[in-house]
């Protein structure tokens, strides 16, 4: 309808008016398309008066926009940069996962991570192992504070119940224990939280120490019954070292919770975890029958096994806390 109306108006006009109307429309169309063409083409096809008029208009708006652009460029450059980076890297997400959040929360955020608590336990064991290497195996300060014995316990060094669980002398001993801690401890921490892993580690160390002292006390009582008393009995250099109790507690709890999961045994054979429970059972039977030569290590392991069974029973009944 609009096109028909325009045609009727155009036909109804006189010839001079029609000529002016066509010329005006052509100039407007050329002016609207002049910015799309190169400068030489626009100057070639557009009349000079149209070009000069458009240049004046363009100069007016360019001056206004240029001043605004300068203000934005020099006055608000930091705000524009901040807006750009905020769209790429949100401040909330970066703070929660970057170094800023770590600096604000400190060691609490680090210890709350599953891998962080495992790494911390490994570092603690490695530090005590280094102290044994530097100070020597015969250093009395290390023996009194990082080895559990009847002498250290009777002289009031109760902290050796826990510190002996971080103490290793042999390189093979610490490597095997830390491998088990990293493999099974990380899964326990992810399932129940890092605090639960710490509690389980300390409970395993305490359980192994209690079993060691109980066995030592029973052996002394039996010797007294047979009237065989060693000279200076309090200073008998029989002590407990190593994280066998904590590692056995963590390993066996993981096996009891996930018995059908397959894992690498001896870093070579992929076998079900339940086979590890069978191997631990044979070890305990040999120890009870007196066929195991290293009775002190087996007692430490037995303490960890008891702690794992108690923890597994509490988990099944829902009586555990993170």
Curated annotation (Swiss-Prot):
GO cellular component: chloroplast membrane
Lineage: Eukaryota, Viridiplantae, Streptophyta, Embryophyta, Tracheophyta
UniProt GO BP: proteolysis
Function recorded in the entry: Rhomboid-type serine protease that catalyzes intramembrane proteolysis. May cleave the plastid translocon component Tic40.
One family name in Pfam for this protein: Rhomboid
Location of the transit peptide in the chain: 1-52
Principal subcellular localisation of the protein: plastid
InterPro entries the UniProt entry points to: Peptidase_S54_rhomboid_dom, Rhomboid-like_sf, Rhomboid_protease_S54
Locations listed in the record: Plastid, Chloroplast membrane
Transmembrane segments: 110-130, 166-186, 201-221, 238-258, 265-285, 295-315
GO MF terms held by the record: serine-type endopeptidase activity
Keywords tagged on the record: Chloroplast, Hydrolase, Membrane, Plastid, Protease, Transit peptide, Transmembrane, Transmembrane helix
Protein's name according to its UniProt entry: Rhomboid-like protein 16, chloroplastic
Family that this chain belongs to: Belongs to the peptidase S54 family.
């Amino acid at each position: 309808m609009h096109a028909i109306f325009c045609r009727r108006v155009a036909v109804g006009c006189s010839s001079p008016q029609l000529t002016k109307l066509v010329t005006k429309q052509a100039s407007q169309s050329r002016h609207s398309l002049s910015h799309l063409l190169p400068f030489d083409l626009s100057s070639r096809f557009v009349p000079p008066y149209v070009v000069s008029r458009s240049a004046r208009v363009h100069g007016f708006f360019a001056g206004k926009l240029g001043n605004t652009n300068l203000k934005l460029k020099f006055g608000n450059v930091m705000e524009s940069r901040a807006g750009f980076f905020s769209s790429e890297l949100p401040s909330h997400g970066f703070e929660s996962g970057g170094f800023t959040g770590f600096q604000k929360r400190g060691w609490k955020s680090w210890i709350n991570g599953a891998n962080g608590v495992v790494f911390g336990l490994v570092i603690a064991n490695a530090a005590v192992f280094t102290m044994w290497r530097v100070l020597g195996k015969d250093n009395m300060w290390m023996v009194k504070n990082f080895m559990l014995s009847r002498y250290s316990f009777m002289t009031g060094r109760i902290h050796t119940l826990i510190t002996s669980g971080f103490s290793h002398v042999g390189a093979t001993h610490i490597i095997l224990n830390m491998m088990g801690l990293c493999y099974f401890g990380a899964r326990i921490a992810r399932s129940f939280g890092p605090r639960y892993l710490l509690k389980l580690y300390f409970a395993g160390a305490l359980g192994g120490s209690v079993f060691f002292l109980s066995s030592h006390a029973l052996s002394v009582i039996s010797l007294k019954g047979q009237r065989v008393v060693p000279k200076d009995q309090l200073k008998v250099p029989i002590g407990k070292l190593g994280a066998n109790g904590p590692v056995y507690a963590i390993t066996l709890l993981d096996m009891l919770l996930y018995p059908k999961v397959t894992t690498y045994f001896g870093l070579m054979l992929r076998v079900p975890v339940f086979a590890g429970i069978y191997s631990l059972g044979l070890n305990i039977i040999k120890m009870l029958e007196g066929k195991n030569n290293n009775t002190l290590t087996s007692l430490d392991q037995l303490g960890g096994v008891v702690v794992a069974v108690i923890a597994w029973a509490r988990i099944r009944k829902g009586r555990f806390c993170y």
